[in-house]
């Protein structure tokens, strides 16, 4: 594994709030992608009481070459998970919550119904909490995407992850154009929902391929793109081809905005849920400004 440049080095997570969040997640038997995927931002986020809850269990039915989440045969769904999630959101006094999941290709609806239950339970407890979902592709199961879109999360995120050429190596069980179809379907079903997608760089892609992904996402009416450095979780995972410099990330941000995205987060440590609450507020302001500009013209 390559040694990391200085701009990717972070402090070890610690602090009273960090441990409070960790203990609360354990108390309610909730998984977080922060821990399961070994996110480098866990210390910063948890000390701000920001956590991305991972529902549908901790075992994924796929084994993507970039992901640190355990794969295999998953356990049965926890019927109490939606209620426990809502309780934890209340105790943490979250204003914006991010819900993601493992892939559950074994379930008839891919787990989409469980997403809906989680959204409904959180809103039952507090209608003011804004909700962001980061869903898998549900294996293109009939009605799954529409079911979650109809539940009207404030943000619907589905990560494109990498360029089409690398899918066979990095996401062998996924299909690039199905991910685009999912994002387009969400916007068609519920135009008010902000759509979001993320891509990792440093896997061997070219700049031209990244620009094409940006074009494809804009063609699917995606509002928000996140671009971050791929980090190899273990020697068994896909190797890092190179570390993209902060200056290159700034350039990607400039290009993405020029292509019409409402919001762009681009940087070495950017992840799908990084600063999600703050970015949601910026998204709303940017959309309002866009409407005002269109109205004045």
Curated annotation (Swiss-Prot):
Pfam families the record matches: LIAS_N, Radical_SAM
Cofactors demanded by this protein: [4Fe-4S] cluster
Entry's localization field: Cytoplasm
Predominant subcellular localization, coarse grouping: cytoplasm
Homology family: Belongs to the radical SAM superfamily. Lipoyl synthase family.
Residues engaged in binding [4Fe-4S] cluster 1: 34, 39, 45, 273
Organism (species): Ehrlichia chaffeensis (strain ATCC CRL-10679 / Arkansas)
GO molecular function: 4 iron, 4 sulfur cluster binding; lipoate synthase activity; metal ion binding
Keyword annotations from UniProtKB, A to Z: 4Fe-4S, Cytoplasm, Iron, Iron-sulfur, Metal-binding, S-adenosyl-L-methionine, Transferase
Protein name per UniProt: Lipoyl synthase
Pathway involvement of the protein, from the record: Protein modification; protein lipoylation via endogenous pathway; protein N(6)-(lipoyl)lysine from octanoyl-[acyl-carrier-protein]: step 2/2
Enzyme class: transferase
Cytoplasm recorded as keyword: yes
Domain Radical SAM core: 46-262
One GO cellular component, as annotated: cytoplasm
Reaction equations catalysed: [[Fe-S] cluster scaffold protein carrying a second [4Fe-4S](2+) cluster] + N(6)-octanoyl-L-lysyl-[protein] + 2 oxidized [2Fe-2S]-[ferredoxin] + 2 S-adenosyl-L-methionine + 4 H(+) = [[Fe-S] cluster scaffold protein] + N(6)-[(R)-dihydrolipoyl]-L-lysyl-[protein] + 4 Fe(3+) + 2 hydrogen sulfide + 2 5'-deoxyadenosine + 2 L-methionine + 2 reduced [2Fe-2S]-[ferredoxin]
Cofactor note: Binds 2 [4Fe-4S] clusters per subunit. One cluster is coordinated with 3 cysteines and an exchangeable S-adenosyl-L-methionine.
Superkingdom of this protein's organism: Bacteria
Sequence positions that bind [4Fe-4S] cluster 2: 60, 64, 67
CDD domains from the UniProt entry: Radical_SAM
Gene3D superfamilies, alphabetized: Aldolase class I (3.20.20.70)
Lineage, uppermost ranks: Bacteria, Pseudomonadati, Pseudomonadota, Alphaproteobacteria, Rickettsiales
Entry EC number(s): 2.8.1.8
């Amino acid at each position: 594994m390559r040694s990391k440049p200085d701009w990717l080095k972070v402090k070890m997570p610690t602090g009273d709030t960090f441990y409070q969040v960790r203990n609360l997640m354990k108390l309610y038997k909730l998984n977080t992608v922060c821990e399961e995927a070994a996110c480098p931002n866990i210390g910063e986020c948890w000390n701000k009481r920001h956590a991305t809850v991972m529902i549908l269990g901790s075992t994924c039915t796929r084994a993507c070459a970039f992901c640190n989440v355990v794969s295999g045969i998953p356990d049965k769904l926890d019927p109490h998970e939606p209620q426990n999630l809502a309780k934890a959101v209340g105790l943490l006094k979250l204003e914006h919550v991010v819900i993601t999941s493992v892939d559950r290709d074994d379930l008839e609806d891919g787990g989409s119904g469980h997403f809906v239950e989680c959204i409904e339970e959180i809103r039952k407890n507090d209608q003011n909490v804004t909700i962001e979902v980061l869903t898998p592709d549900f294996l293109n199961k009939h009605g799954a995407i529409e079911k979650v879109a109809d539940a009207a999360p404030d943000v619907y995120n589905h990560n494109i992850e990498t360029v089409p050429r690398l899918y066979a190596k990095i996401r062998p069980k996924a299909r690039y154009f199905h991910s685009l179809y999912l994002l387009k379907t969400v916007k068609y079903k519920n135009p008010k929902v902000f759509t979001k997608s993320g891509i990792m760089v440093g896997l061997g892609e070219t700049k031209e391929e990244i620009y094409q992904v940006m074009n494809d996402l804009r063609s699917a009416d995606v509002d928000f793109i996140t671009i971050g450095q791929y980090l190899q979780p273990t020697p068994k995972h896909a190797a890092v081809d190179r570390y993209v410099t902060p200056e290159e990330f700034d350039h990607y941000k400039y290009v993405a905005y020029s292509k019409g995205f409402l919001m762009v987060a681009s940087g070495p440590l950017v992840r799908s849920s990084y600063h999600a609450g703050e970015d949601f507020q910026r998204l709303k302001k940017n959309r309002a400004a866009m409407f005002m500009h269109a109205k004045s013209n």
